[in-house]
Regions:
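Short, charge-patterned binding micro-sites
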Residues: 41-60, 309-313
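Glycine-rich, mobile lid/loop segments that gate access to catalytic sites or pores
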Residues: 8, 68, 75-239, 363, ...
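Internal helix-turn-beta structural module
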Residues: 48, 300, 308-392
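A short glycine-rich, hydrophobically flanked beta-strand micro-motif that places a catalytic Asp/Glu
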Residues: 39-43, 171-177, 227-231, 297-308
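N-terminal, positively charged regions that mediate nucleic acid binding
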Residues: 1-42, 48, 379
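Alpha-helical support elements that line or immediately flank enzyme active sites
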Residues: 14-33, 136-153, 272-296
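Glycine-rich anion/phosphate-binding loop at the beta-strand->alpha-helix junction
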Residues: 200-294
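Conserved phosphate/anionic-ligand binding catalytic regions in large, soluble enzymes, centered on
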Residues: 10-12, 16-21, 121-137, 238-263, ...
Length: 392
């Protein structure tokens, strides 16, 4: 008998202070890759009040104005209103950058070095990464995080278009879905907190967002008289963004991935070039898992990788289909090894990652986005046929 339970996931909009920092970090990364595809970038950002600090390690031939890129990132989010202390044109920017450590560089470069196990390009660090896919939604993502992102994306559209003039950039969404086994059947609760101007009343915020946002995004058949709507439950959200909370790059890793339903290795994505397996191997894991599900070989699939710094081969690769596999799991794992290559250099090549594509990934999830498959290559299902053939 299938078990009924509720699973919740949250998302944040691009105006959330942590996402402001993720956006800045990925703007800096793309600025490097635009001029030098072989740039090595690890860029962190902190935002508080009307101050932004960027720091990290960059080895690149790219030349650009860091401060201008920071302001451009903030402007794209929409922090240009006079009623917000944090502002693209007036914020103070502090930059503290150095080059990548020579010790790390020799491990990652495609060269021989004393004490290095191989001359091939190695992983940029040790660590473990996960990829996940399931058949709950057309984009093969878990329903709670998928709809939390869709609410956030539409909320931002309503703000930027001017359709709801009292909206401001900072917001969070949370969706609780009731399941019967692995099948989502109804929405138990929607939580939405959005920054707003001081002159709008709570009653208008609640009514507007339920009618114009939630009911237009969530499947009507999943909403019922028992669905709970918690809209700005503190009663006021005027102070937001970095004015209200300090933001730091890399603090929304569960929002960025699978909303807690698929596991996470702990490494953040934003501000890191693809030699960092925290990012590139996580993208690879999604590509593998999505193609397994798209091929009909499982209803759910999770892939785990582990790497050692400077080493070209993964230490381990494992596959779990949660008892939903249509073929023997050992056979599936062999097929995955035959179809995909997990060396860091090959991941970069297969997914075409040495391009300035990363600011497209920053907000509303790095996975489940099918609006730009040319950039987000890990969302393609172009290996499903090869996998089916490999297990035949």
């Amino acid at each position: 008998m299938s078990r009924r339970y509720i699973f919740s996931s949250e998302s944040v909009t691009e105006g959330h202070p942590d996402k402001v920092c993720d956006t800045i970090s990925d703007y800096i990364l793309d600025a490097c890759l635009e001029q030098d595809p072989l740039s090595r970038v690890a860029c962190e950002a902190l935002a508080k009040g009307n101050l932004v600090v960027i720091a990290g390690e960059i080895t690149s031939n790219a030349k650009f104005d860091f401060e201008e890129r920071v302001r451009s990132a903030i402007r794209s989010i929409g922090y240009v209103n006079g009623d917000c202390i944090f502002h693209a044109d007036t914020c103070r920017v502090i930059c503290e950058m150095s080059e990548q450590s020579r010790d790390i560089k020799q491990g990652v470069d495609n060269i021989a070095a004393e004490g290095k196990s191989s001359a091939e390009q190695g992983a940029g660090d040790q660590g473990l990464m996960f990829g996940f896919a399931c058949d709950e939604t057309p984009e093969l993502m878990p329903a709670p995080i998928s709809f939390a992102h869709k609410l956030g994306r539409e909320l931002t559209r309503l703000r930027k278009s001017g359709e709801i003039p009292w909206l401001r950039p900072d917001a969070k969404t949370q969706v609780s879905i009731e399941y019967n086994g692995y099948k989502p059947v109804r929405v138990a609760a929607v939580v939405l907190s959005t920054q707003h101007t001081a002159d709008v009343k709570q009653k208008e915020i609640r009514e507007t967002l339920i009618e114009l946002l939630i009911k237009n995004v969530m499947p009507a058949e999943w909403l019922d008289e028992k669905t709970t709507y918690l809209i700005n439950p503190t009663g006021r959200f005027v102070i937001g963004g970095p004015e209200g909370d300090a933001g730091i790059t890399g603090r929304k890793i569960i929002c960025d991935s699978y909303g807690g339903m698929g596991r996470h290795g702990g490494g953040a994505f934003s501000g890191k070039d693809p030699s960092k397996v925290d990012r590139s191997a996580a993208y690879m894991g999604r590509w593998v898992a999505k193609n397994v599900v798209a091929a009909g070989l499982a209803d759910r699939c999770e892939v785990q990788f582990a790497y050692a710094i400077g080493h070209p081969e993964p230490v381990s690769v494992s596959v779990d289909t949660f008892c939903t596999g249509k073929v023997d799991e050992e056979k599936l794992e062999r097929a995955i090894w035959n179809v995909f290559n997990f060396k860091p250099a090959e991941i970069i090549k297969q997914l075409n990652l040495l391009r300035p594509i990363y600011r497209k990934t920053t907000n509303y999830g790095h996975f489940g986005r099918v609006d730009d498959l040319d950039a987000l290559t890990w969302e393609k299902t172009n290996k499903a046929g090869a996998l089916k053939q490999a297990v035949a």
